[in-house]
Amino acid sequence: MLFVVNGSLRMSSGKIAAQVAHAAVDLYKQLIKNQPEALEDWEEDGETKIVVRGQSTDELQTLEARAKENPLILTSVIEDAGRTEIQSGSLTCLGLFGTNEQLN
């Protein structure tokens, strides 16, 4: 799993952790439903999770569009509810699941 956090939003560490967790849970649910064999492989491989910082909302949207070109890559777009630090509807995190080759 790869998570791209929107660096332009200046979220606290706790907020970033929560947004990444939302994306991870969403991807996990998608894997259970759509790609159970890939989920099993990922679990047997150590459940690798990588978090990187994106520069902007535009960058996350571009990455999402590129990922959706490959039907084997799962995506999770997290938009904030606006209850704490960030304006409602802000794209906070993009979660991606695929093989290393697919995500590079």
Positions of the model-derived regions?
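Glycine- and Gly-Pro-enriched alpha-helical subdomains that act as flexible
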Residues: 1-34
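Short, hydrophobic/π-rich interface segment
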Residues: 58-66
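Surface-exposed loop/turn and secondary-structure junction residues enriched for glycine/proline
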Residues: 12, 19, 34, 42-45, ...
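Short, solvent-exposed amphipathic alpha-helical segments in soluble enzyme
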Residues: 18-21, 65-69
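Alpha-helix N-cap/helix-start motif
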Residues: 13-14, 60, 87
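Compact, glycine-rich, soluble single-domain proteins
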Residues: 29-47, 53-57
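Residue-level preference for alpha-helix termini and adjacent loops
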Residues: 8-10, 15, 38-41, 77, ...
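Short basic, glycine-rich beta-strand/loop surfaces that mediate nucleic-acid
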Residues: 2-4, 45-55, 68-104
